[in-house]
Swiss-Prot record:
Chain segments carrying region Involved in dimerization: 205-447
Post-translational modification: Methylated at arginine residues in the RNA-binding RGG-box by prmt-1. Methylation promotes P-granule degradation by autophagy.
Effect of residue 676 to A: Reduces methylation of the RNA-binding RGG-box. Abolishes methylation of the RNA-binding RGG-box
Keywords for the protein's UniProt record, in alphabetical order: Developmental protein, Endonuclease, Hydrolase, Lyase, Methylation, Nuclease, RNA-binding
Effect of residue 627 to A: No effect on methylation of the RNA-binding RGG-box
The encoding gene: pgl-3
Species in which this protein is naturally found: Caenorhabditis elegans
Enzyme class: lyase
Protein name: Guanyl-specific ribonuclease pgl-3
Domain-related comment: The dimerization domain also acts as a hinge; changes in its structure probably impact oligomerization and RNA-binding.
Low complexity bias (residue ranges): 447-468
Region of interest: RNA-binding RGG-box: 633-693
Oligomeric form and interacting partners: May form a homodimer. Interacts with pgl-1 and pgl-2; this association is not required for P-granule localization of either pgl-1 or pgl-2. Interacts with sepa-1; the interaction is enhanced in the presence of RNA. Interacts with prmt-1; the interaction is direct.
Length: 693
């Protein structure tokens, strides 16, 4: 394999060999460092003097050995690890493995523990005059030095010979050269760095000389930056007090404020889950008064809060690399809740709220999700968001995990995340009594990994460049618009097919046109109960809002019945005692009264449609519709309803058809010519007369 070459790079006027990634970060984020140092990289802030707190070893390693870095950056970072001492030796060894995967080898890796070979390499290096040899020579001298003063003297060679004042100053800060003997010399190196910044990045010089802008931080924001176990009760009490104040006023502004405060409480819940302190979420819920809890977690969400917390905590910890064991979902009640459609949907709604709370800026200033964590805040937010999105997938595609649509929704996961989840769930399944659901999840992840991404699948892009900034505000735009708008084409398309096919209009939401609901067979089944809704509960646009005052009935079916009600005059057959003057005769010729049916059947058609009441009634031959007794039909939209249990017929558009089976359905009506009743082959005796047009 090819040995590494030590080369000096210049990034916007900043020359460096040991810290090219840091130099690139400073050059790309000078405004952020000046205006919002709290959200900047901690190593950068420490080097520029914005903070006196030395970053942790992990934070230093993230900058000198970044993920997906080039072989050049990786080799330079390995040299820094050797200078920083034994604490960074494991980082050096892991860097050597990564470098070999890139087809290169570090020249010191195989001989670092062999003093004889190191001494021989140092002698050979003195004979070379390249910058590569000069840097290696200084590096070997620093590694052989014992005292801090001696180390600094050797490092200062980089400043005089190679103009690497920036590297010398950073190493001096990290090694803690703060003795009085070295203070004056370090100040000279610092002045050299600020002079270089003046020509290329004047804002960085201003920061090093004047220090960072110190904005006044309100006590509540300061409280949120302290460890959660110390601040949780005070933070919840503060939010609840503001929530109750807003509840005293019923206007749009107070509703918006209450929504924001509710998400602040949910943010605290998600923070506890990301921090591995799941019990803190229960504390947060218990500190909320019942009235506040009912608004933040309405309805069934309050009942499934525990299950949502356990599911979210499980997946978040997997994404954050936790190796601890997890509780059986059946034991904590999560498995049972997932089996219920409505409880599962309530869990999904909570998971969506969890995601919004970390993606949106719920507070007046950006608050890191885990202030005390050594991990980059943006990395934490990305992992938590992906974890919650996968937990949401579990709830939304429960029972259909292996379907194509479900697999396409997993494209947001990277191959590394899928493998991590598969390994974790396989270990998790070993201790379960019922493994069906978990096995379905594993199978879906494996299928998604092996299949090619769909062209319509959701695509995500990530940037591993050096311009990464640790701010939640920059992550807000990632999922701001979770719903897409579906445009239905209107030219060159079969609109009937488009309208009747299901369309995806949002996450797990589809819509399709359907035929209108047919008229009910029994009019008596219609519920004509008057509405009792108060004006405060329902508004004219159908939304629950205190700013509207027009009432709507609670049952839309009532409105439909009112709209469908026929406005034509209804003619009711006279009672037997009133029919003495009919065509049957008069006086003693009155026929024996027939039983009056209970139901009155309402029909409607193209023309006026009277109610057919009783077993028979005569209509004129030129009327708008024919009435049949034993199954007669009529012209118009619908046939008459047949007696003796008959159902109603259908409207025709051409010639009228003959009524059929008086015990089953009435005859088919017509638009131009009425139909006649038919029963036992006798037409017109008890049947209806011919209808008109």
């Amino acid at each position: 394999m090819e040995a590494n070459k030590r080369q000096i790079v210049e990034v916007d006027g900043i020359k460096s060999y040991f810290f090219p990634h840091l130099a690139h970060y400073l050059a790309s984020n000078d405004e952020l460092l000046v205006n919002n140092i709290a959200q900047a990289n901690k190593l950068a802030a420490f080097v520029l003097g914005a903070t006196d707190k030395r970053p942790s070893n992990e934070e230093i390693a993230e900058m000198i050995l970044p993920n997906d870095s080039s072989a050049y950056v990786l080799a330079a970072g390995m040299d820094v690890c050797l200078i920083l001492g034994d604490d960074f030796r494991p980082k050096f060894d892991s860097g050597a493995e990564k470098l070999s995967q890139l087809g290169q080898a570090h020249d010191l890796a195989p001989i670092i523990d062999d003093e004889k070979k190191i001494s021989m390499l140092a002698r050979k290096t003195k004979l070379k005059k390249s910058n590569d040899a000069k840097i290696l020579q200084v590096l070997l001298k620093v590694l052989g030095a014992e005292e801090a003063e001696e180390k600094f003297v050797e490092l200062s060679e980089l400043s005089s010979a190679l103009d690497l004042d920036f590297d010398v100053y950073v190493l001096a800060k990290l090694l803690g050269f703060a003795s009085e003997e070295l203070q004056e010399e370090i100040e000279i190196i610092r002045d050299n760095v600020t002079d270089a910044f003046e020509a290329c990045k004047p804002l960085l010089k201003k920061l090093m000389i004047e220090g960072p802008k110190i904005d006044s931080v309100d006590p509540f924001t300061q409280l949120l930056l302290t460890p959660q176990e110390e601040s949780i009760e005070k933070a919840v009490s503060h939010i609840v007090a503001r929530f109750e104040e807003a509840s005293a006023v019923e206007d749009d502004e107070s509703l918006v404020l209450k929504s924001q405060l509710g998400y602040q409480l949910i943010f605290l819940v998600v923070r506890s889950l990301a921090d591995g302190k799941r019990d803190a979420s229960r504390t947060i819920q218990s500190l909320m008064p019942s009235s506040v809890r009912a608004e933040v977690f309405p309805g069934l969400q309050r009942s499934v809060f525990k299950s949502a917390v356990f599911l979210a905590s499980h997946i978040i910890q997997v994404f954050l690399g936790s190796m601890k064991s997890f509780e059986d979902w059946a034991f904590v009640g999560l498995a049972e809740d997932l089996e219920s459609t409505w409880r599962r949907r309530a869990i999904a709604e909570l998971l969506k709220k969890f995601r919004i709370s970390v993606l949106e800026q719920c507070f007046s200033q950006p608050i890191p999700l885990l202030p005390q964590s050594e991990l980059n805040n943006e990395t934490v937010i990305e992992n938590v968001n992906n974890a919650l999105q996968f937990a949401l997938w579990i709830t939304e595609f429960y029972g259909s995990e292996s379907e194509k649509k479900s697999l396409n929704q997993l494209q947001f996961l990277s191959p590394k995340s899928k493998n991590l989840l598969v390994d974790s769930f396989k270990k998790f399944a070993q201790g379960l009594d019922s493994k069906d659901h978990v096995n379905r999840i594993i199978e879906s992840l494996e299928k998604s990994s092996s299949s090619e991404p769909s062209a319509t699948a959701k695509q995500t892009t990530t940037s591993n460049g050096p311009t990464t900034v640790s701010t939640a505000a920059q992550v807000v735009t990632v999922e701001k618009m979770p719903f897409s708008r579906q445009t239905i084409p209107c030219e060159g398309t079969d609109l009937a097919n488009v309208l009747n096919s299901a369309k995806i209009i949002g996450e797990s939401v589809t819509v399709a046109a359907h035929d209108v609901i047919p008229e009910k067979l029994n009019a008596e089944k219609n519920d004509n109960t008057p509405s009792t809704a108060s004006p405060v509960q329902f508004s004219s646009d159908g939304w629950d809002s205190p700013t509207k005052s027009v009432a709507l009935p609670p049952k839309i079916s009532t409105l439909e019945e009112e709209q469908e009600e026929d406005t034509t005059i209804t003619k009711v057959s006279p009672q037997p005692q009133e029919r003495t003057g009919t065509a049957w005769g008069s006086g003693d010729a009155t026929p024996v009264p027939l039983a009056t049916p209970v139901n009155e059947y309402k029909v409607s058609g193209f023309g006026a449609a009277p109610v057919a009441s009783g077993f028979g009634q005569f209509a004129s031959s030129n009327g708008t519709s024919g009435r049949g007794s034993y199954g007669g039909g009529r012209g118009g939209d619908r046939g008459g309803r047949g007696a003796y249990g008959g159902d109603r017929g259908r409207g025709g558009s051409g010639d009228g058809s003959r009524g059929y089976r008086g015990g089953d359905r009435g005859g088919r009506g017509s638009y131009g010519e009425g139909s006649r009743g038919y029963q036992g082959g006798r037409a017109g005796f008890f049947g209806g007369s011919r209808g008109g047009s």
